[in-house]
Amino acid sequence: MPSKRTRLIAGNWKMNNDLNEAKDLAQALVAALPEIPEGVEVCVCPPTVDLRVVSCKGGVKESPIKLGAQNVYWEASGAYTGETSVAMLKSVPVEYCIIGHSERRDYFKETDEDENKKAKALIAGGIVP
């Protein structure tokens, strides 16, 4: 008998919301979704600079809403200005990460090979791509 699949509803906030707006939006979502049906996961993916405030108490920390990142770099550390490692995301903590987004491919010319490296790094680090 096939296993029941979990449905994922993810909100990609893209490059929107300052710190206060991100916290307010997280609080509004938590208030609107005190319970999530079985077989469904809800995830929010704010900009990297907002991950910590959204993850805290008063954000999604004590709610059924999961936290995701919008991007990751596959190297563990190094001179990669502006990039975020898997370990950095785990410390927030992040459970999901968007990869292979059409905007990353179009604007930053990311390739299948790049996305494969990201996926492998995320899986090795315990984050769902």
List each language-model region with its residue ranges.
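Active-site loop-to-helix "anion-binding N-cap" substructures in soluble metabolic enzymes
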Residues: 1-129
